[in-house]
From Swiss-Prot:
Keywords: Cell cycle, Cell division, Chaperone, Cytoplasm, Isomerase, Rotamase. It is found in: Cytoplasm. Its main location: cytoplasm. One of its GO terms (molecular function) is protein folding chaperone. Transmembrane segments: none annotated. Belongs to the FKBP-type PPIase family. Tig subfamily. The lineage of its organism: Bacteria, Pseudomonadati, Pseudomonadota, Gammaproteobacteria, Cellvibrionales. PROSITE patterns: FKBP_PPIASE. This is Trigger factor.
């Protein structure tokens, strides 16, 4: 086998590989001989078909199979010979496949970058702490009450938290636009499910009233023709409903799995869940800071093929979420056309870069999966189910799930390593701040 390696641009490599014709011819002859023992052709007994007939009937197909196998095998042999680490699948371009002549093909592919992780000591991280107070528990219980509340019509002006039934018609430059009209739409004021300014304009209206609300569409609105555009909505309120909160009694507690122990047990369960949520959120904030620090401190050449694969994974994830949310309405949608690559490119590049950096740290520091940490992570998940032991057994019996937990454990171990070298300061925040997503905090 002859191999020629060329570095084209950046991480791209081009391998020209030659395979002796004899290697292919011998394998074709071997497979045809094996096939002759079992093929059935009219006019011949099984195993007695002449090789010339077998060659005529099956030779071309067998040769194609052998060529495919030989090219695939010789590519990876060449990669090992040149000590390369391909990232993604190669693009194979056959140059010479004629029978009787040496085979030649060109494989174009990317390799993993050489990474030297540095700057861990310069990473600055704030380790947040928070306490779940009695007031936090009261607020959470009120939220749970609202989730089970009944709605009753009111004659007063609408306020935040009310549910309204509205008709509206939107215009831009005096012209109606697609999707800007609806009748009998239910909306909870303060849910932020409409564009900014729309719900605020309805607050203070009574049933039967009509108002014109002026709004400006966000610059990142999904419909390109409306991005940043000013519009007017003529809104008529059909109905205003206020919430009627349920009493804190055994019937209410039972809806959340508390069948004995009354309010004391209910409050204890709520606090326990809040503590769990708080710890998860604080761990997430810490990890995010560490990962941001790693990306900022290390510039990495990113293989385009890995980014492309990550984009596809992110798009599929969002597509699955849309399928779950919209059901049959989302069937047949070409997600690639409505969810373009640019939507996910930045996130995909970051994820690939982080994956490469974390993998390099694991390799350099010789970090192996902490089995006790894996066990702890699985037990944390299992504790939220009615039969924890069944969940634990299920995880350990599912190779894919277990692999995901082991990957998460490795990430936690890397975070711990970085924290041991980084500049860490402590800060106490409220429970509300602790559980609030980072993106939402940034907006505020």
């Amino acid at each position: 086998m002859q191999v020629s390696l060329e570095t084209t641009t950046g991480l791209e490599r081009k391998l020209t590989v030659g395979i002796p014709a004899s290697v292919v011819d011998q394998e074709v002859a071997k497979r045809l001989k094996e096939a002759a023992k079992t093929v059935r052709i009219n006019g011949f007994r099984k195993g007695k078909v002449p090789m010339s007939v077998v060659q005529q009937r099956y030779g071309a197909g067998v040769r194609q199979e052998v060529l495919g196998d030989a090219i695939n095998r010789s590519f990876y042999d060449a990669v090992r010979k040149e000590s390369l680490r391909p990232a993604g699948q190669p693009a194979i371009e056959p140059k010479q496949l004629e029978p009787g002549k040496d085979i030649e093909f060109v494989a174009t592919f990317e390799v993993y970058p050489e990474i030297e992780v540095s700057g861990l000591e310069s990473i600055e991280v704030t380790r947040y702490n928070a306490e779940v107070t009695d007031a936090d528990v009261d607020t959470m219980i009120e939220t749970l009450q609202k989730s089970q509340a009944d709605w009753a019509p009111v004659k007063r002006k609408s306020k935040k938290g009310d549910r309204v039934v509205i008709d509206f018609k939107g215009t831009k430059d005096g012209e109606a636009f697609e999707g800007g009209t609806a009748e009998g739409q239910t909306l909870v004021l303060g849910s932020n499910s409409m564009i900014p300014g729309f719900e605020k304009g309805i607050i203070g209206m009574k049933a039967g009233e009509t108002e014109t609300i002026k709004v400006t569409f966000p610059d990142d609105y999904q419909e390109e023709s409306l991005r940043g555009a000013e519009a007017e909505f003529e809104v008529t309120v059909q109905k205003v409903e206020g919430q009627k909160l349920p009493k804190l009694d055994d019937e209410f507690f039972a809806k959340f799995g508390v069948t004995e122990g009354g309010e004391e047990k209910f409050r204890a369960d709520v606090r326990e869940n809040m503590e769990r949520e708080k710890q998860k959120a604080l761990k997430g904030k810490l990890k995010e800071q560490v990962m941001n620090g790693l990306v900022a401190a290390n510039t990495v050449d990113i293989p385009k093929s890995l980014v492309s694969g990550e984009i596809d994974a992110l798009r599929n994830q969002m597509g699955n979420q849309m399928m779950q949310q919209y059901g049959s309405q989302a069937e047949g949608i070409d997600f690639k056309s409505i969810l373009p690559d640019d939507m996910f490119k930045e996130q995909a590049e970051r994820r690939v870069a982080l994956g490469l950096i974390v993998s390099e740290i694991v390799k350099n520091e010789k970090i192996s999966v902490d089995k006790e940490l894996v066990k702890s992570l699985i037990e944390d998940v299992a504790s939220t189910y009615e039969h924890p032991e069944e969940v634990v057994n299920y995880y350990y019996g599912n190779e894919q799930l277990l692999g995901g937990v082991e990957a998460a454990a490795l990430e936690e171990q890397v975070v711990s390593l970085v924290l041991s070298k980084a500049k860490v300061s402590d800060e106490t925040i409220s429970y509300e701040e602790a559980v609030k997503p980072a993106a939402k905090q940034a907006e505020e």
